[in-house]
């Protein structure tokens, strides 16, 4: 499964999304399937080429099949294709896209002969836990922790603040490593 790529760990992976995609494509092995979080055409082309060269099925998450039904601090309800009223406790539109990637991976596994029930799928989504990602620790006052550490994560955090905390006074405490693009990160949060 190839998740959403961002300009992170560039000292190891490369300085462009295409270079990072090339490095990440190294995990694609013959005899397997690859699942891709859809991105820019140039990034997708890197994975398409790697899969073709290795004779690997490439499954791309179809975000157009994703419909958000409701969201609150209790979680989100969404539809994905023919699956309706799926529940996930993770917050934010980006987490729905991540869930779509998971469901795409499950579809690939089922096509490869794995036995995964609808109940297993729903339970897995409903019971997932990701500490430190827009996690509500306490109510009144609300205390939320988010360990995002790159501009892409901060963009998701900023959107979550707009979606879940609109019109409220917010105090933010941040810490960013010196090697991160903290200027862009703070501009995103402003």
Give the residues covered by each predicted segment.
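Acidic, Mg2+-coordinating active-site environments of NTP-dependent enzymes
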Residues: 2-85, 99, 103-122
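Nucleotide phosphate-binding/pyrophosphate-handling subdomain across enzymes
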Residues: 1, 5-6, 19, 82-190
């Amino acid at each position: 499964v190839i998740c959403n790529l961002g300009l992170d760990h560039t000292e190891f992976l490369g300085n462009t999304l295409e270079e990072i995609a090339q490095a990440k494509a190294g995990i694609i092995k013959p005899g397997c399937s690859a699942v891709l979080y859809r991105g820019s055409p140039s990034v997708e082309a890197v994975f398409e080429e790697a899969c073709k060269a290795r004779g690997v099925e490439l499954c791309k998450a179809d975000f157009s099949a994703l419909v958000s039904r409701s969201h609150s601090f209790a979680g989100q309800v969404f539809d994905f294709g023919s699956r309706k009223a799926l529940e996930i406790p993770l917050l934010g539109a980006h987490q729905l896209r991540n869930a779509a990637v998971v469901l795409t991976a499950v579809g690939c596994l089922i096509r490869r002969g794995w036995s995964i029930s609808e109940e297993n799928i729903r339970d897995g989504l409903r019971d997932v836990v990701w500490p430190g990602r827009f996690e509500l620790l306490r109510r009144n006052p609300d205390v939320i922790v988010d360990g995002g550490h790159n501009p892409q994560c901060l963009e998701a955090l900023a959107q979550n603040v707009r979606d879940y905390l609109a019109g409220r006074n917010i105090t933010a405490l941040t810490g960013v490593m010196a090697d991160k693009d903290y200027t862009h990160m703070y501009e995103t949060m402003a």
